[in-house]
Amino acid sequence: MSALRNIPPNRRPGAVSIRDVARRAGVSIATVSRAVNRIPTVDPALAERVWRAINEVGYLPNTQARALVSGRSHMLGLIVSEITNPFFPELVQEFENLAVTQGYEVLIGSTNYSSERTESLIRRMLQRNVDGVAVMTFGIEEDLVQKLVEREFPLVFVDAGPDLPNIRVLKVNYGEGIRQAVQHLAALGHRGIAFITGPLRLRSAVSRRDAFLKSMAELGLIVPAEHIVEGDHTMEGGITSMEQLTALAELPTAVICSNDMTAIGALHALYRTTQNVPQEISVVGFDDIHLAQFMLPPLTTVQMSCKDLATAAVEALRAGIERDHPKAAKTEWHIPTRLVVRQSTAFPRGTLPALIERAAGKRRGVGVD
């Protein structure tokens, strides 16, 4: 709520009391208190009237007092892997927007893929009395998981977590999106398809690689060992991995990357070696960050929606925090993935459809080489 900008310049925040709010809203002080503390039994129309009055008089609820009354801080912790990958700031924005509209503040931290830093962040969030923490890092060591679950307060993990009452898990269906990507490339005529993984110490990276191998096997397509290259989810790693693939005696005709940052690095490496995308090699990413649609060419990618993840994470935390939440007994949330086809994939070079497309492009005066 934007109460701060409504405070008259000659009045200190403390000078506006809960009594002023009650008087303006025409309700009792107890009703204001229940509305401020998001007690679910308060009539929604009445709660809206209270919050309107709060804005009008410029009242700032005392968060410490709220915590004493409700037994909760109304703060959620959110831990992400890093902030240099645009996927995570997009996820943070979606999570915070949802949490704030539902009456929660958010404390945010990034681990830079360090288990020690993750543990330190959790400890600091506990010191701030957060009601629960979403660990959205897509990979966390088992010994650290055990330390965290012993805290016995609501936790949300991605992909896997212990089967305990305070743990809720967001299970991403990596397989469906990657299967769609492989089938899309195979339908175009690609047979030599390579895969650049993420760091294989991460469970999510292993899941994506295994989904790729399974999808290729389902189509009877062979994957030479040299067509699987371990990356690190960065643009620099994408450049290095793509250079490794272009150095092969037989270049794959398509490459699927473990995330969009890797794919952007791969595009850069191909540009430097004058390999045209998609005329000479097709590239597919994973995540569908906002930047993907503005690449040249626009990146075909597997979408893992930040909004879906954030919505599930906030709902899962609230289910663990609020005893009367309608999904309090639920322990798993499933996150879909799907292929978004743009312009970084095409028929393999030298095939009849590619030759026809090339000829048509030349007739239109389009540079296709």
What is each stretch, according to the model?
Residues 1-12, 56, 97-102, 126, ...:
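Bacterial carbohydrate/catabolite-sensing allosteric modules
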Residues 12, 56-62, 116, 136-138, ...:
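Short gly/ser/thr-rich secondary-structure transition/capping motifs
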Residues 24, 29-34, 68-84, 94, ...:
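Short beta-strand segments enriched in small/hydrophobic residues
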Residues 77-79, 107, 134, 156, ...:
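Conserved hydrophobic packing residues within short motifs/helices of P-loop NTPase cores
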